[in-house]
Amino acid sequence: MGKAHATPQLLFGGTFNPVHNGHLVSAMAAREALGVDSVTLLPCYVPPHKTAPTIAAEHRLAMLQHVVQENNHLCIDTCELDAGESIFTVDTLAAKRELWGASASIIWLIGWDSLHNLSRWHRWQSLLTFANLAVVERPFAQSDDINSLPPAVRNWLQQHRVSAKQLTQQANGGVALLHTPRIELSSSDVRQRLGAQKSIQYMVPACVETYIRAHKLYTH
């Protein structure tokens, strides 16, 4: 675990298929909880054989670009899209560590569901070698929630858990549970409603809905 000497870099990865208000509430709440300047969105590459309904990466990126234009606390990193292939999170973080140096505080933002399934991630125990993790948590989470985690993840969390403030002061090695609003919304919810020709108002930013309608996305 190293002490940080640079502006913390808060990274939020996902397919963003499409980006929705749940993503944005989580990103902004995490930014405030950690006291950082901005959140970098990292859209991931989606293989063409993936069974879930997907759209071209250019559309997913375009929707993010529209969102970023309306929020100066958000920016986009296309490193995974540019690679043109699936990249494990641990490899992305290793590359960022090499790029930014040993003293940069790198924070990868995940949801509670991702924490619960973390032991299924490729080389999950190596994630903290390169970065910190911030977990978007329910605002009134109880100790029972932590006890419900798989034993390996729960023990790992107990060993590495720090406060939000500590997280931004160290380069890597910590995990913070953030008390942030929780919105029960997913990209699949949005896609299903679009496929059923139902309204998605208030589920996505207006600029995203306009783009989806203009390009007739997720209609099948």
Curated annotation (Swiss-Prot):
Keywords: ATP-binding, NAD, Nucleotide-binding, Nucleotidyltransferase, Pyridine nucleotide biosynthesis, Transferase. Its EC number is 2.7.7.18. It is an enzyme of class 2 (transferase). Pathway: Cofactor biosynthesis; NAD(+) biosynthesis; deamido-NAD(+) from nicotinate D-ribonucleotide: step 1/1. It comes from the Bacteria. The keyword Transferase applies. It catalyses: nicotinate beta-D-ribonucleotide + ATP + H(+) = deamido-NAD(+) + diphosphate. GO terms for biological process: NAD biosynthetic process. One of its GO terms (molecular function) is ATP binding. CDD domains: NMNAT. Catalyzes the reversible adenylation of nicotinate mononucleotide (NaMN) to nicotinic acid adenine dinucleotide (NaAD). Belongs to the NadD family. PANTHER family: NICOTINATE-NUCLEOTIDE ADENYLYLTRANSFERASE-RELATED, PHOSPHOPANTETHEINE ADENYLYLTRANSFERASE. This is Probable nicotinate-nucleotide adenylyltransferase. It comes from Saccharophagus degradans (strain 2-40 / ATCC 43961 / DSM 17024). The lineage of its organism: Bacteria, Pseudomonadati, Pseudomonadota, Gammaproteobacteria, Cellvibrionales. The gene is nadD.
